[in-house]
Amino acid sequence: GIETNYGKRHAEYSVFNSLYTQVISLPKRSSWATRELFELLLYSKEQNINPFELQGSYAGAFGYGQFIPSSFNRLSIDYNRDGTKDPYNWEDVLGSIAYYLTENGYPKNNYNFSFRSPAWRSIRTYNRSDKYANTVIDFRNELSKKVFLSY
C-alpha cells in the first residue's frame, strides 16, 4: 500500500525485465532473482497472462500489496472467491496481506505494536528494515487515532 500510495501511483517497470536485469547485472541478487523470475513465470502461466505485461517496482514486486512473485504464489488468497488471486483487487490484496502477516507470526487479537513485538517482527519479514517496520507501525498508530476519533 505505502509503495503504491494505496493504488494511486501505478507501477513503472516490467516485473520480468526488473528481475531479469537483476539476474544478469547484480551478482549478489542473481540467485534470488532467478528464483523470483521462475515464480513469475509460474504465476503468469496459472493466471494465463503475458509475463512481459505485468508491471511493478524496480525490485520486481507487483500489485497493490507489492508482493514479490514467490510470496504472492505462496501466500495470496482469493478472498472474494471469484476464482482469481488478483493483486489489483482490494479484497484479495487485503486478505492476502492479512494471511501473509499471520503466516509470519502476527498474533490474533494483538494490541502490542512495540519494537520487536511479534506484530513488529511479522511486519519486518516483508522488508527486513527496522525503519520500515517502525514506519508501518507509526502509520498504523496515526490511522487508528483518526479512525477512532471519527466515531
Question: What are these model-derived regions, one by one?
Answer:
Residues G1-Y151:
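Catalytic glycan-binding domains that act on GlcNAc-containing polysaccharides
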